[in-house]
Amino acid sequence: MSQPELRDNRRVILDGQPQVRFRAAGQLFDRIPLANLSHGGCLAIIPFQEAGALCLDTPVTELVIFHPGMTANPITARVAWTIAHAEGDQVAVGLQFNDMAHDTRIALVAVVDSAILESAKR
């Protein structure tokens, strides 16, 4: 049996190689691949050996998304969840956005909505 969808926002997979940079738990995570993005958060894929300090509700600062159309203004967020299937695997880290500048919000909505429209055409 599958779990009901609890997320509030539709996730999209972006073209290209979107990445994110952020600080959390006293560490800088730089050029981390993004698996998906939404109006409310993103899914980062972090090497197991680097992700150990990230647990539920860890504050995230200075988050910047590297993708055409996004601004370089930092976003604050929190770790919403993490999952790794086995030691040594990469860790999927769900980040929930808390606060961002108005122009960053506008850019984020435009990027996500554009990806949704493109996927609907396929």
List the model feature ranges, each with a label.
Residues 51-55, 106:
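Short, conserved charged micro-motifs
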Residues 14, 73-75, 91:
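Hydrophobic core residues within well-ordered beta-strands of beta-rich domains
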Residues 31-33, 75-81:
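Short beta-strand-centered aromatic/proline hotspots
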